[in-house]
Amino acid sequence: ISGGSKKSAEGKLSYMISGSQKAFEVAKPILDCTSETVFEFGEHVGSGSAMKAVNQMLAGVHIAAMAEAITFGITQGIDPKRFLEVISKCAGTSWMLENRTPHIIDNDYSPKSSINIWPKDLGIVLDIAKNSNFSAPLTAAALQQFISAAGSGLGQEDDAAVAKIYARNAGIKLPQN
């Protein structure tokens, strides 16, 4: 499942599922009323979970990369609002950047998706990678930033609060409103 609590409340989740056709047919009415998109991955058990792991890998890395980029930009004198305006129209954008950067600009870290989910989710991704003998250094680096944020007491805040770790380490202030 992908989409978080907001999309869940709107019935706009994305499901990545695998299993028997019979199980899918039984679940279809529920899937249809709670989702915007259902991706089927055949009957091989675990294929949908594998896709979810890939999605979480990208999402977590994108959030950490956004936090790193905006704080780096601030150290270079770039206004955070201008950062969002420009990057959202350039090759460096991502859905996570466009969705999470406003949280930093508005100094609003009320949890839409909390820091605390990322040590779990990226930990699972890295366990899968390890079991597959796959090196995932970007994911490992993102995980360390989320662990640092959780260990600094930010675990219940929105996952955009990982930018506070970058800001602390750089000796800068994020927007305060």
Regions from the PLM with identified roles:
Residues 32, 88-89, 143-147, 167:
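Short amphipathic alpha-helical surface patches that mediate protein-protein
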Residues 45, 49, 93-160:
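Interdomain hinge/lid region at the active-site interface
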Residues 22-23, 65, 79, 93:
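Short phosphate-engaging motifs
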